[in-house]
């Protein structure tokens, strides 16, 4: 019958999706998610334990040490450094205002991050570190954004502010071939009925309207130090935002479909874009917030709610869709 045929088609599509997820990083038994640095304690959204990650997705979270990253960084060769600088100029639109010393500092850290990912077989990572002002680790953590953006673009998403669950959301979007860029809500334009999202952390090349810019920031937003950051807008068209949430009954997914639209944004070294949702900006923000997510989310291109529902069913995780 037609109904039976539809059920069979959905099962086949679901099996393909699960197979795609299991064949890559998050559900691959040979790979882990990484967590290095420390929690951003002033943000309660970051209190999401490794146990929750394991129970929700079967993800092993490797606790990484800054001293290991420092050791890898000190062993970077001149050849590796030159190759990474060439990669920067190939993948990024490097602003002329970027100081050569900052490019070298970021490139050295990027090589060390690559090595960390390879050694620990990481499929995703979350990070944050402050420490005492002027320490060696601050020099490292203020130079990670370029390297983390490269990793994100290569399918190993990196979430800032140590939010493990957002790294998981980014990974899901990456596996769905939707990108998955680190972002957060920061403004609303009621006249244009849009919501603005952005972040100074890792971006994803696949969703950028133009080549991702590498720009200098004389002071990081709400964090110590200075260094390089990225600047981009999401290409106009259909988008999906996804958040992995933790409620009183455990892990659940929160998703919404909308549209990235053109318009004015702040040029401050962020992934700034404007988004319009069918229910309108006011109702969207009201319903999204009442679901109880953190203010971070993963942005991907295309409408992916149908696939996310199948994934949630196969993993036995609830999903809430804001429509």
Q: How would you name each of these model-derived features?
A:
Residues 19-139:
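A charged, amphipathic alpha-helical module
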Residues 152-267:
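C-terminal catalytic subdomain
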Residues 223-323:
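Extended hydrophobic packing segments that form well-structured cores
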Residues 2, 54-64, 178-179, 317-321:
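Structural alpha-beta junctions
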Residues 1, 12, 37-46, 128-135, ...:
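Gly/Ser/Thr-rich loops at beta-strand to alpha-helix junctions
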Residues 138-157:
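A short, gly/pro- and small-residue-rich
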Residues 64, 121, 128, 179-187, ...:
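Flexible, glycine/charged-enriched surface loops at secondary-structure junctions
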Residues 3-8:
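Short, small-residue-biased leader/transition segments that mark boundaries at the very start
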